[in-house]
Amino acid sequence: MKIGIIGAMEEEVTLLRDKIENRQTITLGGCEIYTGQLNGTEIALLKSGIGKVAAALGATLLLERCKPDVIINTGSAGGLAPTLTVGDIVVSDEARYHDADVTAFGYEFGQLPGCPAGFKADDALIAAAESCIAKLNLNAVRGLIVSGDAFINGSVGLAKIRHNFPQAIAVEMEATAIAHVCHNFNVPFVVVRAISDVADQQSHLSFDEFLAVAAKQSSLMVETLVQKLAHG
């Protein structure tokens, strides 16, 4: 099995990249892909850049160039579920766009024409992630993760997301674009991220302060998940 891992930012990939054995770097389309072995398992780790276009471009290049069997999206996210605090883990069962609106033509809010309203994560990957969470004794929530090209740190943006997606557990800027590409390529995916902030008016301050905490937690989760997928 070859496992594809995608993070947007340097801070979100550096801990995993440093552990890759026989590492090679591919620079393509503004993205960097690091290939090699993580604890003996073949992986391809992508640093995509921030936002939906960068994530979709990077995911496409990763899938075409490296042919991974599954995709794990890692990194940080803003917490929406009331039980979440910094460092907690969120696992997607579905991903949706929070900034797409074609409702004038009868689509659901967040749905693009020709696409499902939401992109379902793979059940086996979800189960494997939850097994790792239990093993590591981490606090985690599974549910809907929403994505858009905005960092949510104000009451207006937050209220709009809560109105349109009251069940959403976390918000960030890449996961749904990655899920969209995986859907088109028929490649299983799951989003496993750590909370860096609670999406409120102070979230930009919390993000800067706690990004390293989120990166450490999400990297630990992904490393454990890779081992689980490779060895059971």
From Swiss-Prot:
Reactions catalysed according to its record: S-adenosyl-L-homocysteine + H2O = S-(5-deoxy-D-ribos-5-yl)-L-homocysteine + adenine; S-methyl-5'-thioadenosine + H2O = 5-(methylsulfanyl)-D-ribose + adenine; 5'-deoxyadenosine + H2O = 5-deoxy-D-ribose + adenine
Active site: E12 (proton acceptor), D197 (proton donor)
Enzyme Commission code: 3.2.2.9
Pfam families membership: PNP_UDP_1 (PF01048)
InterPro entries: MTA_SAH_Nsdase, Nucleoside_phosphorylase_d, Nucleoside_phosphorylase_sf
Molecular functions (GO terms): adenosylhomocysteine nucleosidase activity; methylthioadenosine nucleosidase activity
Subunit: Homodimer.
Family named by the database record: Belongs to the PNP/UDP phosphorylase family. MtnN subfamily.
PANTHER family associated with the record: 5'-METHYLTHIOADENOSINE/S-ADENOSYLHOMOCYSTEINE NUCLEOSIDASE, 5'-METHYLTHIOADENOSINE_S-ADENOSYLHOMOCYSTEINE NUCLEOSIDASE
Stated name of the protein: 5'-methylthioadenosine/S-adenosylhomocysteine nucleosidase
